[in-house]
UniProtKB/Swiss-Prot annotation:
Its EC number is 2.7.1.15. Substrate binds at residues 78-80, 106-110, 210, 325. GO terms for molecular function: ATP binding; metal ion binding; ribokinase activity. The gene is RBSK. It holds the Pfam family PfkB. Its main location: plastid. This is Ribokinase. It comes from Arabidopsis thaliana. Its cofactor is Mg(2+). Homodimer. Pathway: Carbohydrate metabolism; D-ribose degradation; D-ribose 5-phosphate from beta-D-ribopyranose: step 2/2. PROSITE patterns: PFKB_KINASES_2 (PS00584). Belongs to the carbohydrate kinase PfkB family. Ribokinase subfamily. The active site is at residue 325.
Length: 379
């Protein structure tokens, strides 16, 4: 069994109240006032000066007061099996890859890794298999890796860790095939109070669509009731998003392809993107954060003028895997730190620019010092 991660055998019915090991921070670190109810949220977010020099902070893992409500990511964790190829194979064709390796990834794990590497207190709620891929992910995310708190990650012995085949082409673009594994099949029907407690006490929550919609709905409803902002990254399943989920989120974050799929509308021009976003507004989503790849990003707030952000050019594009996750997580970190919308977009753009310059998803996530340095020299 992996260190710091509880094991759940599913040869019998899953018990959502099963005890699990918590060797690290307890939930009390989320609530700076022990006199408050375990489910009450701090009324204010205490953020320290965000020094570009991590050594200037009391906690080398965090640039923010440890009592600040954390970023909580509920989602997927995958082992990304990379194969570098010159081009995609044609139907019936077999081609040779230049190289191959396995790295930790998955949209949820990527976003959690990014939050922690940006030195904001970050918790990950997810499911792994008891296998080599699960161990790889736990080591990449945990104290010896990115510094993500894994108190709410559970492992199961009858489902494999989720994995993905990433076909990386010579121009840095990629195509991905995902096997859900534990991400899709190891969750309980009803989320435990323990798992919901951490999201109720969060400063902000990130969701994606690589885990069951039923889990996202339970989390989003609990978060909405607690008054915690939640961002839903559209990446993952290509099925329609349930209205129950849309009704409980604050920000919907698709890329332009996902926006087109979601609305059934073209998204080739900014005008078309704006029209597609208007359809999302009619579905009840007031804020839509659209990732536009090489064209940058845009935040659409219902009733307001869109806020556009150009890309911050990368010295070289090595691998775009994880760039969208980096952008979303960096935006969330800036948002929970109280930055303006414009500052959030720029901070996220800088993080994404650094991400695409390194191969792999989690290995490419930038640290705060690098992001601040890029922002300083790209004004």
């Amino acid at each position: 069994m992996m260190k710091g991660i509880s094991s759940v055998s599913q040869s019998i019915n899953y018990n959502p109240y099963i005890e699990f090991n918590r060797p690290q921070l307890q939930i009390s670190t989320v609530n700076p006032n022990p006199a408050q109810s375990r489910f009450s949220r701090p009324r204010s977010l205490r953020v320290l000066s965000l020094s570009a020099d991590p050594s200037a902070n009391r906690n080398p893992k965090s640039a923010v007061d440890a009592h600040a409500p954390p970023l909580v990511v509920v989602g997927s964790a995958n082992a990304d099996i990379y194969v570098e190829i010159e081009r995609l194979p044609k139907e019936g064709e077999t081609i040779s890859a230049k190289t191959g390796q396995t790295l930790a990834g998955g949209k949820g794990a990527n976003q959690a890794a990014c939050g922690a590497k940006l030195m904001y207190p970050t918790y990950f709620v997810g499911r792994l298999g008891e296998d080599a891929h699960g161990k790889l992910i736990a080591e990449a995310l945990g104290d010896d890796g990115c510094g993500v708190h894994l108190d709410y990650v559970r492992s199961v012995n009858n489902e494999p860790t989720g994995h993905a085949v990433v076909m990386l082409q010579s121009d840095g673009q990629n195509s991905i095939i995902i096997v859900g594994g534990a991400n899709m099949k190891a969750w309980p029907e009803i989320m435990s109070d323990d798992d919901l407690e951490i999201v109720r006490n969060a400063g902000i929550v990130l969701l994606q669509r690589e885990i069951p919609d039923s889990i996202n709905i339970q989390v989003a409803k609990a978060v909405k009731k607690a008054g915690v902002p939640v961002i839903l990254d559209v990446g993952g399943m290509d099925t329609p998003i349930p209205n129950e989920l849309l009704d409980s989120i604050d920000i919907l974050s698709p890329n332009e392809t996902e926006l087109s799929r979601l609305t059934g509308m073209p998204t080739e021009t900014f005008e078309q993107i704006s029209q597609a976003v208007a359809k999302c507004h009619k579905l009840g989503v007031k804020q839509v954060l659209v990732k536009l790849g090489s064209k940058g990003s845009a935040l659409f707030i219902q009733g307001e003028k869109p806020i556009q952000q150009s890309i911050i050019p990368a010295a070289q594009v090595v691998d775009t895997t994880g760039a969208g996750d980096t952008f979303t997580a960096a935006f969330a970190v800036a948002m929970v730190e109280g930055k303006s919308h414009e500052e959030c977009l720029r901070f996220a753009a800088a993080a994404a620019s650094l991400c695409v310059q390194v191969k792999g998803a989690i290995p490419s996530m930038p640290d705060r010092k690098s992001v601040l340095k890029l922002l300083k020299f790209s004004i």
